[in-house]
């Protein structure tokens, strides 16, 4: 059995780490490189960086901080933000990133997933999915350009359909960003995770809602996700990664202990 992964998420805007609630009202958390090093030292299995306005601004993630992060950490990290071509991805990987993640650009051009997977290998290609539960329809819908609340829009895709589509096109991993739960800290949406897990054959990462150590346990035990991503509980030092891993190991979760 592969060890479950604990993954801090760092949303980047204007060169700093920020955090919002339900993808809105972002506050500044701090500088990118010191936070990355802190999480690596605490025992994170990998890091994910989202340049949250790159896609909506029509630009690619700023590569300068990617190189600086690579210099100070020795764990894998994934970078997302406006990657629209093989050349964009190649440059980010050349600066030291281990994986690249695409989200809004994949919705705009689904063939991008296949082209990137063919060029760099599926293990390198992550697809992020921003999913929102609509009370009116009772369905989960995929959203696009969520880094800018003024440009966010609901797409034609229902979440489960898009999960299956991106797998067929070559996604090597899926990060499910559950927008209703984002920053609220009342637990991951286990109902949605179970539905996605039923149709997801590649590694599945839960994102959105972690507030306690028990929430991580529930995601691993009840929804069988491969990794749990969180931001505010780590940024605000509500949960220490080393202590979280010790707790999970004590509950029988296969986890890498530093």
Curated annotation (Swiss-Prot):
> A Pfam family this protein belongs to?
His_biosynth
Keywords associated with the record: Amino-acid biosynthesis, Cytoplasm, Histidine biosynthesis, Lyase
Active-site positions, per UniProt?
Answer: 11, 130
EC class of the enzyme, as a word: lyase
What Gene3D superfamilies does UniProt report for this protein, alphabetically? Aldolase class I
* Pathway entry: Amino-acid biosynthesis; L-histidine biosynthesis; L-histidine from 5-phospho-alpha-D-ribose 1-diphosphate: step 5/9
Compartments annotated for it: namely: Cytoplasm
Q: What does this protein do?
A: IGPS catalyzes the conversion of PRFAR and glutamine to IGP, AICAR and glutamate. The HisF subunit catalyzes the cyclization activity that produces IGP and AICAR from PRFAR using the ammonia provided by the HisH subunit.
Xref: NCBIfam families: hisF
Family indicated by similarity: Belongs to the HisA/HisF family.
Q: Name the chain's protein.
A: Imidazole glycerol phosphate synthase subunit HisF
Q: Which organism is it from?
A: Salmonella typhimurium (strain LT2 / SGSC1412 / ATCC 700720)
